[in-house]
């Protein structure tokens, strides 16, 4: 199991206890975060590539730990994502010699093990944030978060996640996703098929809706993309920069996941004007306006019928996609996301 029992830090606090916060801070209209105070040096890990890419739109420098041969979690600056100059590859052997302003943890092992292996004592006393990407696994409502520290900040990526986790005494806030709008990519939908984009679906089981996908694919034409998609008869991985244009030709985007955080792939599909068909679970229930920007339901039979309707009516699909794009650009604007993260970093560092 990924989760362990709650861990109480034994490090001395770096300052006064943080004030509990909830809800995402909103960007002030007309405020340019590039003109704010000095750039901060943030140490973090390459945990989710697309999230890291959007995170680096914040006006700071991000140092990502790397190991030889780039094993999972230690890829550093790698892959096909068009990283900016503010993402700096940092070998773990060099971390203790660096000066940082803040440590951003994104996984239990990073907090429980890596900081003691690769950071010096002074670095471990720096302001710290734990970014929780996931819903609680072992129990949906009664699972205590493993970070138990009134001097850290726990960031959840959706209001649903924050609701379900027992965050204990750790101060929390929600920073909802943000995504960039691809230049020159717009929904076409000429291909009478649906698209599913999930990594490693074959080995992630019922939680990610592998069985739901297979039943839906038996009823309507669906293509699966993502890492190891070939194992389930899919098309394989599409590079992040090419995925929007590739997805735009499909009639709709199908999200079969039962229980997880709101996927960035859904938001990216909405950004280009794709209608969404999804299970009405987790944060998805607040994102899709049923019958307006797509269709959500807990009945697989109903969702299959809706997918068939979209395959038969291209214009209706386009109308739903237009509404999905408006929602995405209002709620998941990258400028708001970057401003929220800038505010979080400056809150813990008091800079």
What are the language-model segments listed below?
Residues 253-254:
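A short hydrophobic beta-strand element within the catalytic core of glycosyltransferases
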Residues 312-350:
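A charged, aromatic-enriched C-terminal amphipathic alpha-helix characteristic of glycosyltransferases
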């Amino acid at each position: 199991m990924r989760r362990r029992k709650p861990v109480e830090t034994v490090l001395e606090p770096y300052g006064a206890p943080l004030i509990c916060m909830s809800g995402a801070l909103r960007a002030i209209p007309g405020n340019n975060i590039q003109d704010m105070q000095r750039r901060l040096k943030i140490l973090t890990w390459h945990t989710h590539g697309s999230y890291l890419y959007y995170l680096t739109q914040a006006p700071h420098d991000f140092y990502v730990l790397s190991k030889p041969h780039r094993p999972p979690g230690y890829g550093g600056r790698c892959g096909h994502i068009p990283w900016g100059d503010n993402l700096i590859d940092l070998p773990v052997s060099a971390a203790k010699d660096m000066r940082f302003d803040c440590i951003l943890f994104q996984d239990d092992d990073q907090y429980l093990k890596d900081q003691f292996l690769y950071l010096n004592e002074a670095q471990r006393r720096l302001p710290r944030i734990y970014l929780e990407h996931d819903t609680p696994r072992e129990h949906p409502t009664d699972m205590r978060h493993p970070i138990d520290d009134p001097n850290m900040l726990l960031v959840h990526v959706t209001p649903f996640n924050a609701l379900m986790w027992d965050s204990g005494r750790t101060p929390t806030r929600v920073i909802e996703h943000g995504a960039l709008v691809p230049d020159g990519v717009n929904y076409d939908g000429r291909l009478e098929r649906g698209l599913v984009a999930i990594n490693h679906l074959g080995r992630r089981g019922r939680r990610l809706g592998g069985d739901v996908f297979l039943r839906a694919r038996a009823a309507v034409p669906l293509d699966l993309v993502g890492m190891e998609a070939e194992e389930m008869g899919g098309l394989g991985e599409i590079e992040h920069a090419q995925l929007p244009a590739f997805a735009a030709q499909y009639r709709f985007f199908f999200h079969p996941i039962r229980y997880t955080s709101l996927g960035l792939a859904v938001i990216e599909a909405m950004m280009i004007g794709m209608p969404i068909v999804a299970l009405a679970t987790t944060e998805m229930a607040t994102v899709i306006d049923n019958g307006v920007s797509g269709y959500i339901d807990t009945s697989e039979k109903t969702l299959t019928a809706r997918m068939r309707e979209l395959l038969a009516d291209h214009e209706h699909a386009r109308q739903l996609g237009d509404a999905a794009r408006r929602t995405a650009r209002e709620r998941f604007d990258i400028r708001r996301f970057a401003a929220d993260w800038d505010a979080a970093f400056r809150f813990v560092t008091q800079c």
